Amino acid sequence: MSSTSKHPKGLLFLAFTEFWERFGYYLMIGIFFLYMTTDMKEGGFGWENAKAADVFGTFIACVYLTPFIGGLMADMKLGYRFSITLGGILMGIGYCLLSIREEWAFFTSLGIMIIGNGFFKPNISTLLGNLYNDPKYKDNKDTGYNLFYMSINIGAFFCNFIAAFMRIKYGWDWAFIAAGIGMFVGVITFWIGMPHYKHVDVRKEPKPEDKPVIMRFLKVLAIAVGFGAIGWFIPDTIFGSDSTDGFLFACIPVIYFYSTIYKSCNEEEKKSVGTMYTIFGIVIIFWAIFKLNGTALTTYANSYTDREMPSGWVATTKYLYQCDNSVVAKNDSVFQLDEHFRKIKDANGKPVKCVDYPPYFKNLAPEKYPEQGKELNLIPTELFQSINPFFVIFLTPLVVMFFGFLRKRKKEPTTATKISYGLLISALSTLVMVAAVYYTNNGNTKASAWWLVGCYGVITIGELCLSPMGLSMVSKLSPARYTALMMGGWSLATSIGNKLSGVLAKNWDKFDDKANFFWLNFALLMIAFTVMMLLLKRLNKVFNQ
């Protein structure tokens, strides 16, 4: 870029750094649930859906908790460049450690990734924002962030094709190593671009009036860890698993802390903070449903969806290792499953084995069976995880243009109204899956892949109406002295939603009629939408002040 460019030179390097970071993260996430549930003889852990969903939900919940702490530490002590470098290296190590199929390595790697994400994620955005504080670039800040976030989704789109390639050709371990290599490439890219942003790595000294609040919050976090330990180690379980008990117990002191923040506000501030708290609570439900893409919808793609590769694509996809040929039409020793792919257990609770075709054949139409001993040519399950980022890339400019069109005519809806629309549209996406279940007679036959494409397409529109509004809302409404804490509140809401997503997915196998699972999702989103509509007039009054 020339010196007269509308954007700082550092944008390109930060965008590519973020591309590689998201590449690694979403590559890992795309195969994470599959890895946990795949039979051990095929390289996975062989866990049941409920355990895998619980681990998945806890992980993505913690991933959204640590960035607030990492951001505070970078602001107060570590600096942004060091934090980004440390976080990137830790995440790369974590991804590579997943290649060791041992539970100690598995859970250690998750902890390392959670900590690394906390250092990396908030600080690269802050560094980018600091670049645009230069008066030369200030007017193009929104465009710069759009380009930056576009890189996120490009990374999220392409990574699943690499995941499929590495898994099919080399195995699960090399797929995770590829995620780690991607993260290390991101760190190297960041360091190559260092001359273009080292001058904006300026720590913000907290204002004297902010320090007591920040220190109080850090003490609350320490107490939350103690509460979490109590929840984890209490005998039996209250909410279905030790991790859920621990997580919800840990939330108690944090939520109490946020209630004291509200009480400390003056009457004018209480209106804004109360509005944010209301929306925080409501979007928890959105995230709980949205994040099912990595668990319940992955299960639906893997077992209930016709993944047969179009015949015209087979030769090319085989050459590129984008065609899964692991399912062969021959009898083998497999776990005995019921009609909904649940393991049948004996009187002692141990899974029963039998001689049968692989599970994929259970609801495959007989006319689609290949000859005995022949392999099927299937779309790799992880590729379905690229549908959402594809729609984000494709639809974001259209949504921006649509709201820009309304803005010019002074008809643009408020942030609260956009969030309401997002909830309603997301609710409609669950009806696509209800229709899919009914059309396939509750999974007795496999569904067309277009049902999942349609579901992801609709919920992506809902996401674009809701997700970008969160941080924008906080920056508009938050009292200046509480902005950082309110950003943390948005992350906390996302984190709780992510954990509840795992709780929902854990119950997938308990639904004999899978339509009822998606009806439950629809009901939850409609309740959230209804609450928003009932409060909309009051919320809009605050936004319009």
Protein language model features and the residues they cover:
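Hydrophobic core of transmembrane alpha-helices in multi-pass small-molecule transporters
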Residues: F19, G94, A105-N123, F280-G281, ...
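Extracellular/periplasmic helix-loop-helix junction of adjacent transmembrane segments
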Residues: F33-T66, N140-T143
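Glycine-rich segments within core transmembrane alpha-helices of 12-TM secondary carriers
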Residues: V63, N140-F161, R167-I168, A175-G186, ...
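Conserved MFS/SLC helix-loop-helix module at the cytosolic interface between two early adjacent transmembrane helices
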Residues: T66-C96, I100
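Cytoplasmic membrane-interface "Motif A"-like loop-to-helix N-cap segments
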Residues: M76-G88, P135, D139, E269, ...
